[in-house]
Amino acid sequence: MAPAPPPPPPAPAPAAAAPAPPLMTGDRSALLNSIQKGKKLKKATTNDRSAPVVGGGVVGERKSNTPKSFAAPPVPTGAPSLPTSSNNTQQAEERPSMPALGGLFAGGMPKLRHIGKSSASAAPPSAPAPPTPQSELRPPTSAPPRPSIPPPSPASAPPIPSKAPPIPSSLPPPAQPAAPVKSPPSAPSLPSAVPPMPPKVPPPPLSQAPVANTSSRPSSFAPPAGHAPNVTSESPKFPNRGPSIPSASVPPVPPSSYVLQQRPNRVDDHGRFHFKDDSYLPIPHPFLGVPKVYRGGSGTTVPLNLSSF
């Protein structure tokens, strides 16, 4: 008999039920349904306040009807014209609107001014100043010029004193020319011409002969007696500068003990150079006409014969 067929496989177990979808709120379900249906979302606008504000507005704003406040005024031409508010308004309206720029140029492109011109380029050039006269260019003086002092007239000149002025005390008395010893008439003229000196000033040197003559003269020519002792007691002694006083003869200078002597010219033949006879020289070796053989340092076949030396 044939074997029985195998039993059929058991039936598969029933499939597990799918998990239930989570409960959704009404707002989320509506948004999800709109996304699933393909509805376009509304584009969001972002107000970025981090950009710099230039010209009174935020960067990115367009001002089509308002004039650019950051633009520089036009450069003045040869014919000066005063800028007015109406002219600026007309120029701003006639100027075509430029596309808005971002960053620092949002208010408009600034114009660079030339070097050397003032910042207020719109101001009209001032009229040239009139030339200043030469009289105004001179600086004002603090005081009027003083008139030059006229030279003194001969009548107002002081009279020339007949006597010599007194010698100042700070300087030593100059040497006065003394009269010669053998001329007695010149002695009385000295007291009359020279006034009495102050007590602290030394008297000028006088020769001995005039002093003796003045003592023999009357007392009217002599100086006051009250001043004489003061002059001699307080005046220092100065060396006499006058040639009239005979000075002591200077002793002759004693002869020096050192006397120059002429040395004889002699030749010292035996001092530096010595010239001697040939007999003092050593005896030279006798000359032998025999050829000598010297041994080389690198070796030679010639034997060394010491008897030949």
Curated annotation (Swiss-Prot):
<feature type="compositionally biased region" description="Pro residues">
    <location>
        <begin position="1"/>
        <end position="13"/>
    </location>
</feature>
<comment type="subunit">
    <text>Interacts with wsp1. Interacts with myo1 (via SH3 domain). Interacts with actin monomers.</text>
</comment>
<feature type="domain" description="WH2">
    <location>
        <begin position="27"/>
        <end position="44"/>
    </location>
</feature>
<keyword id="KW-0963">Cytoplasm</keyword>
<dbReference type="GO" id="GO:0003785">
    <property type="term" value="F:actin monomer binding"/>
</dbReference>
<dbReference type="GO" id="GO:0030479">
    <property type="term" value="C:actin cortical patch"/>
</dbReference>
<dbReference type="GO" id="GO:0000147">
    <property type="term" value="P:actin cortical patch assembly"/>
</dbReference>
<dbReference type="GO" id="GO:0035840">
    <property type="term" value="C:old growing cell tip"/>
</dbReference>
<dbReference type="GO" id="GO:0005829">
    <property type="term" value="C:cytosol"/>
</dbReference>
<comment type="similarity">
    <text>Belongs to the verprolin family.</text>
</comment>
<feature type="region of interest" description="Disordered">
    <location>
        <begin position="1"/>
        <end position="273"/>
    </location>
</feature>
<comment type="function">
    <text>Involved in cytoskeletal organization and cellular growth. May exert its effects on the cytoskeleton directly, or indirectly via proline-binding proteins such as profilin or proteins possessing SH3 domains. Plays a role in actin patch assembly by enhancing the ability of myo1 to stimulate actin polymerization by the Arp2/3 complex.</text>
</comment>
<dbReference type="GO" id="GO:0005634">
    <property type="term" value="C:nucleus"/>
</dbReference>
<protein>
    <recommendedName>
        <fullName>Verprolin</fullName>
    </recommendedName>
</protein>
<dbReference type="GO" id="GO:0006897">
    <property type="term" value="P:endocytosis"/>
</dbReference>
<dbReference type="GO" id="GO:0031097">
    <property type="term" value="C:medial cortex"/>
</dbReference>
<dbReference type="Pfam" id="PF02205">
    <property type="entry name" value="WH2"/>
</dbReference>
<feature type="compositionally biased region" description="Polar residues">
    <location>
        <begin position="82"/>
        <end position="91"/>
    </location>
</feature>
<dbReference type="InterPro" id="IPR003124">
    <property type="entry name" value="WH2_dom"/>
</dbReference>
<keyword id="KW-0206">Cytoskeleton</keyword>
<keyword id="KW-0009">Actin-binding</keyword>
<feature type="compositionally biased region" description="Pro residues">
    <location>
        <begin position="141"/>
        <end position="207"/>
    </location>
</feature>
